């Protein structure tokens, strides 16, 4: 029926949460962006095309899974330098990177040595990229309404306006 909204079940919505603070997210942002680029862009493309978050639950679960795997790898291989780095960011008043360059260098070195991840250059993750996806294109990606007939038939005779043109207020 057109007026009934189908809501997902609780089992469909159940995922493990990424329970971390903003300082941890900020410290890991560059490497996370490089490692989880594809699932994040797939999810954002789905959200933009579908305009309905219920249709993008699977893509959202993949984003969450990638984030959890990413932070587990960081914890397993580079926990100490990463903790020093995000703690430094957390203790600076405005969470600025410039006060923590030494800790950042240690963390980047650890990530490069143990996992082979290179910190992306500034602006590399914000470049426009094409997303290759296996999802089918939505039937109506812009959610536009059907266009009306350009020149509808006018029914009956049209009479001139009673007071003439309404263009000027002083016309009768």
UniProtKB/Swiss-Prot annotation:
Where found in the cell?
Answer: Mitochondrion inner membrane; Mitochondrion intermembrane space; Mitochondrion
Q: Where is this region: Disordered?
A: 133-159
A GO cellular-component term linked to this record: mitochondrion
In its UniProt record, a GO molecular function of this protein is: protein-containing complex binding
Q: Where is this motif: Cx9C motif 1?
A: 36-46
Span(s) of short sequence motif Cx9C motif 3: 78-88
**Biased composition, Basic and acidic residues: where in the chain?**
146-159
Instruction: Report domain CHCH positions.
Output: 33-74, 75-118
Task: Give the residue ranges of motif Cx9C motif 2.
Answer: 56-66
Disulfide pairings: 36-66, 46-56, 78-110, 88-100
- Source species, domain of life: Eukaryota
For this protein, the record's InterPro entries field holds: CHCH, NDUFA8
Give the membrane topology, semicolon-separated if more than one.
Peripheral membrane protein
Q: What is one Gene Ontology biological process annotated in the Swiss-Prot or TrEMBL record?
A: mitochondrial electron transport, NADH to ubiquinone
**Pfam family membership, one:** CHCH
Q: Where is this motif: Cx9C motif 4?
A: 100-110
The answer to whether the entry has keyword Nucleotide-binding is no
Tell me if Repeat is a UniProt keyword of this record. Answer: yes
Q: Which UniProt keywords apply?
A: Disulfide bond, Electron transport, Membrane, Mitochondrion, Mitochondrion inner membrane, Repeat, Respiratory chain, Transport
What the record says about family reads:
Belongs to the complex I NDUFA8 subunit family.
Per the record, the domain comment is:
Contains four C-X9-C motifs that are predicted to form a helix-coil-helix structure, permitting the formation of intramolecular disulfide bonds.
| Stated role | Accessory subunit of the mitochondrial membrane respiratory chain NADH dehydrogenase (Complex I), that is believed not to be involved in catalysis. Complex I functions in the transfer of electrons from NADH to the respiratory chain. The immediate electron acceptor for the enzyme is believed to be ubiquinone.
* Subunit structure, as described in the record: Complex I is composed of 45 different subunits.
Q: What is this protein called?
A: NADH dehydrogenase [ubiquinone] 1 alpha subcomplex subunit 8
What is the name of the gene encoding this protein? Answer: NDUFA8
């Amino acid at each position: 029926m057109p007026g009934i909204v189908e809501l997902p079940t609780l089992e469909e919505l159940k995922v493990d949460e990424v329970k971390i603070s903003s300082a941890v997210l900020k410290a890991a942002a560059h490497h996370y962006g490089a490692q989880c680029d594809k699932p994040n862009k797939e999810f954002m493309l789905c959200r933009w095309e579908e305009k309905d978050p219920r249709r993008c639950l699977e893509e959202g679960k993949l984003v969450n899974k990638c984030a959890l795997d990413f932070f587990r790898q960081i914890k397993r291989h580079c926990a100490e330098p990463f903790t020093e780095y995000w703690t430094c960011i957390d203790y600076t008043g405005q969470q600025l990177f410039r006060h923590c360059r030494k800790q950042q260098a240690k963390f980047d070195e650890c990530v490069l040595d143990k996992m082979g991840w290179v910190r992306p250059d500034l602006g590399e993750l914000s470049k426009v990229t094409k997303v290759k996806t296996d999802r089918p294109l939505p039937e109506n990606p812009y959610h536009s309404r059907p266009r009306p007939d350009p020149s509808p038939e006018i029914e009956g005779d049209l009479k001139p306006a009673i007071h003439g043109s309404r263009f000027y207020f002083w016309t009768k």
